[in-house]
């Protein structure tokens, strides 16, 4: 289980590097999907399956919206791929920054914190994510209404910015 969680962490870092070094929106969404799948798998290994599933659905829904907007705004006839030299050098630089951060964190002693997985805690009467679901539906309702209103407002702002003089996303057919 430990090696699997370490593998998930390694894949999460690779997904973040893929997002940071994306040459075009077509390839950046692949890094986002890898990062979300691996991050939710990491949460699943910690024993919070409901929150992992909810975050996975939210991530994929949000990423599809972002992907559609970014592709419609930056439609390149010849997009750069990850194999071009500029992107490879940038990706290698990001991996080196991550490795330096790991070495410095190990030297300072940041990595001495330990989190147990599902196997560590044994059998419990109430799982952590089930009590979180109760709070999610009771105290979190107002927060989610405010967050939904903010996202709707953001959607209208982005649509208005995209429209400009050429009536980009909002057109009369």
Curated annotation (Swiss-Prot):
Pfam families: Oxidored_q3 (PF00499). Its EC number is 7.1.1.2. The chain crosses the membrane at residues 1-21, 27-47, 48-68, 87-107, 139-159. InterPro entries: ComplexI_Subunit6 (IPR050269), NADH_UbQ/plastoQ_OxRdtase_su6 (IPR001457), Nuo/plastoQ_OxRdtase_6_NuoJ (IPR042106). It is an enzyme of class 7 (translocase). The keyword NAD applies. Its main location: mitochondrion. One of its GO terms (cellular component) is mitochondrial membrane. One of its GO terms (molecular function) is NADH dehydrogenase (ubiquinone) activity. Core subunit of the mitochondrial membrane respiratory chain NADH dehydrogenase (Complex I) that is believed to belong to the minimal assembly required for catalysis. Complex I functions in the transfer of electrons from NADH to the respiratory chain. The immediate electron acceptor for the enzyme is believed to be ubiquinone. Belongs to the complex I subunit 6 family. PANTHER family: NADH UBIQUINONE OXIDOREDUCTASE SUBUNIT ND6 (PTHR11435), NADH-UBIQUINONE OXIDOREDUCTASE CHAIN 6 (PTHR11435:SF1). This is NADH-ubiquinone oxidoreductase chain 6. The lineage of its organism: Eukaryota, Metazoa, Chordata, Craniata, Vertebrata. The gene is MT-ND6.
